[in-house]
């Protein structure tokens, strides 16, 4: 507990120099998480950009597994910003001295335990990278590993195909709700022609016929008057002056 408390004091001093105030409990949880994820840091870590970036790699891998506590990465970024700030270099150096003293005070037993944990984690990490197997696939590793994995993949593909076909069938047709919206209830008016619209159409047809009749009547009246005037004028002429049609040719006399 004394070692962790000393690291917490060093980090809090560095953050305070940059104007950042972090609660002691938060920093204690941060240090415990670092000690769990990267036990090498307590033995050989330092308050340098290179060592802090190396620590980030272990934190990110733990985060990808879903085992890293919330708030660790943001707090790591705050410390990283202080390490690169020239105004905080004096406090960074002071914190580094504290870290050096902690590392020197570690007993051979504590140092050996941390190194042992680090080697175990490194071996597990390298095993996963070399085999290329996921944690679930490692459980199947053995005599029938390939057969078990193949059966599992085939089952997954069949389930995926059935789910895909079901989704395809559902997507081909719209939901029934849309069809219900298309039906007409008894309370809704029919979209056909209403009675008032039919009456208006009939009246419009009668009016149109009346206008056409008046136009035709007005057009024929002048012709009738002209014809009657011509007939009366012809009747007033003497018979000799009336127009005669062409006379018939004289009869042919045989000599």
From Swiss-Prot:
Cited InterPro entries: B_retro_matrix (IPR003322), B_retro_matrix_sf (IPR038124), Retrovr_matrix (IPR010999)
Molecular function (Gene Ontology), one example: structural molecule activity
Alphabetical list of Gene3D superfamilies matching this protein: Retroviral GAG p10 protein
Keywords noted in UniProt: Transposable element
Record field: compositional bias (Basic and acidic residues): 148-171, 204-215
Domain of life: Viruses
Region annotation Disordered: where it falls in the sequence: 135-255
Note: Intracisternal A-particle Gag-related polyprotein: Intracisternal A particles (IAPs) are defective retroviral elements. Due to extensive mutations in the envelope coding sequence, IAPs can only form defective viral particles confined to the intracisternae of the Golgi. IAPs are an important class of transposable elements that induce genomic mutations and cell transformation by disrupting gene expression.
The protein's name: Intracisternal A-particle Gag-related polyprotein
Organism per entry: Mouse intracisternal a-particle MIAE (IAP-MIAE)
């Amino acid at each position: 507990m004394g070692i962790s408390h000393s690291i917490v004091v060093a980090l809090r001093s560095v953050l305070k120099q940059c104007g950042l105030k972090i609660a002691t409990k938060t920093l204690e949880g941060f240090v415990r998480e670092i000690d769990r994820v990267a036990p090498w840091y307590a033995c050989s870590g330092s308050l340098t950009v290179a060592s802090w970036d190396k620590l980030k790699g272990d934190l990110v891998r733990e985060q990808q597994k879903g085992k890293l506590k919330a708030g660790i990465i943001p707090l790591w970024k705050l410390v990283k910003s202080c390490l690169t700030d020239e105004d905080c270099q004096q406090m960074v150096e002071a914190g580094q001295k504290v870290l050096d003293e902690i590392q020197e005070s570690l007993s051979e037993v504590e140092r050996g335990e941390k190194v042992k944990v680090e080697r175990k984690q490194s071996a597990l990490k390298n095993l996963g990278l070399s085999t290329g197997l996921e944690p679930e696939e490692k459980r199947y590793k053995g005599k029938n590993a390939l057969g078990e994995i193949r059966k599992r993949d085939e089952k997954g593909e069949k389930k995926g195909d059935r789910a895909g076909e079901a989704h395809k069938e559902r997507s081909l047709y719209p939901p029934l709700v849309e069809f219900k919206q298309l039906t007409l209830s008894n309370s809704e008016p029919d979209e056909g022609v209403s009675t008032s619209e039919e009456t208006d159409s009939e009246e419009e047809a009668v009016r149109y016929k009346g206008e056409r009749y008046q136009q035709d009547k007005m057009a024929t009246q002048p012709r009738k008057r002209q014809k009657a005037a011509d007939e009366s004028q012809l009747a007033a002429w003497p018979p000799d002056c009336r127009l005669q049609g062409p006379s018939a040719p004289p009869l042919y006399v045989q000599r």
